[in-house]
């Protein structure tokens, strides 16, 4: 999946040069998301997983609460990245408001009305599932990524299937470290 994400991101970046300005901006914002969230964010989480696990396990709350809170925090971070990229539209060659990778340029609007508000019940559902099933952290990553892909398909149609690696990573990273931090 990671190799496919790398290949598709490279193709998107290469095709961005010939695309109309708004399309180019969206493609470059998407590629930037892959670099910042999937690449850099994923690498930092992987390198810091043991200290994070020790920290999270030291918090005196039920693990289900910690899982939901940690996944929600990571979803908020991911949306901060995407909203920032949307607000950087002029850096990508188009006026602010001409190209979006989020529902809005307003972070609070995005998280409270469009994304994280929808994710939290899904995180609660995963906490319930993890109480009864012993999924590995990698299985949680993949399965939640597929759930995210299905969600993106409800918004963007079958086109989202061609971006399956992107959506599996974007969503999977939100739950990988919380799942890794389980007792």
What role is predicted for each listed range?
Residues 1-183:
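Aromatic-rich, lipid-facing transmembrane alpha helices and their immediate juxtamembrane interface loops
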